[in-house]
């Protein structure tokens, strides 16, 4: 599998509702941060606790990859739209956020190093 295929496979694993909670614990660098729509950061364990507690993830899928760029042999930036249907503290959400992610190759293994999620519904036509 090529590096690009490996990273896309990781993204699809992240989008699996059954694996989403533990995904970062299993696949992130030790200094990983997820920046929530509020702008507040959370680490891998914090994300796992949040998704396991307040969020009931019904559906998630990588809708479209807008940009995939090797910044070096060990760094990749990927910007994608995530279709996400979930309930947060009893409130249903059907979101289409844009997500920026940075992957880092550590000891020859690709790990997620950074992820930032936008709010609400992205206008996919603006990416064309």
Question: Can you say where each PLM-predicted feature lies in the sequence?
Answer:
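Generic short beta-strand segments
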Residues: 79-86
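Solvent-exposed, amphipathic alpha-helical segments
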Residues: 6-17
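C-terminal and inter-domain tail/linker signature
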Residues: 44, 85, 111-114
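Short beta-strand edge/turn micro-motifs at domain boundaries
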Residues: 96-126
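A solvent-exposed, acidic/Ser-Thr-rich amphipathic alpha-helical stretch
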Residues: 4-6, 20-74, 80, 93-95
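A short, structured loop/turn motif at beta-sheet edges
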Residues: 68-76, 103-110
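Outer-membrane beta-barrel domain signature
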Residues: 88-90
